Amino acid sequence: MSLIYRLRKSKQPHFIQGVYDYIGEMKPFVKRVRKPHLLLPMLLFKSIEWGIYRWYKTPIRRFYGVKGNELIYMITNACNDRCPKCGIWERPEPQDQHLLVMHFINCLKRLHHNLYQVTLTGGEPLIFKKDVMLIAEEAKKLNVPMVIVTNARFLDEAFLTRYKELGHILVISVDSVEREKWNEFRGRKNFDIVMPKILLAKQILGDQLRIQSVLSKESAEEIPKVKEWCKQHNIQHNIQFNQDFGGTWTNTKTEEVNYDNDTPCAARKNICVYPNGDVVKCFDHRRIPLAKEPLGNIAKQDIIEILCTKRSTEVSKIMKSCNLPCKNMSCNKPQTLLFN
């Protein structure tokens, strides 16, 4: 199923627009039905499905039904740590290019009927803690689950207590639980500061806390220790393969892509926003044909208008057969496969 319906034109009759939408959906569908004797019943079922999605709550189309998309906001490139696995912190956005939080909240409001989750990442999201909490409060009002991926340096009791009340998920990046390696992997000597904050987060958040580790040649011996530590503290743990974000870490020799070409990348359902408001389908977006430039910018355009462009739809179609290494990133995996 394609992502969107065409936007209604203000001067176009409502009925005529519906006819255009119907024909535009059915023509490509009919071409995909290989067995002639199944054409009429399949067309009937497709028409019923079309009617439900055409008139239910929102004009944006779903991939697999209601709440089929994830909205991911890289709120900043800036970071207080200097992790060698990542080079994002080397390119902090200028202050005058940082998106005003209300632009993102407006985007969230426009899309919330379609979202199963909103995720905030970085850089370090909690550098903008006030903005993060505004988004968390709005997500709660809109009944959209939220996830923050953080290094935990800026966590405090007040933030954690309110976050717990909102019912959202917190994911903390941990690649070692030993002081020396921790400080090496973080590029900062902050083990004794951050570890107590992680334990405080567990105490307050309980099952709303997750730990995520990056598997690379450098961290391979540390990850089993992190996994065991999480088991001892009853914290769900996820391992993500190393990706090229401009860092110096290298992939393990045994690393393999877990998806074949027949399994569509989940990122085609993603809606990703950069710190300046640029919209892409995936943070490796520019490696995809037709995607060398952003699809639009939510500070200048309505998000639905951006998603309704032909290029946005074509990029999503291309991603059905995309098999780049970023397919193994957490944001591109089905949620049921992430934590154990």
Q: Which residues fall in each region the model found?
A:
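Short, well-ordered alpha-helical microsegments
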Residues: 128-129, 155-157, 219-223, 280
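Residues immediately within or flanking Cys/His clusters that coordinate Zn2+
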Residues: 72, 76, 80, 262, ...
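Short loop/turn motifs at secondary-structure junctions and domain boundaries
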Residues: 64-65, 260-265
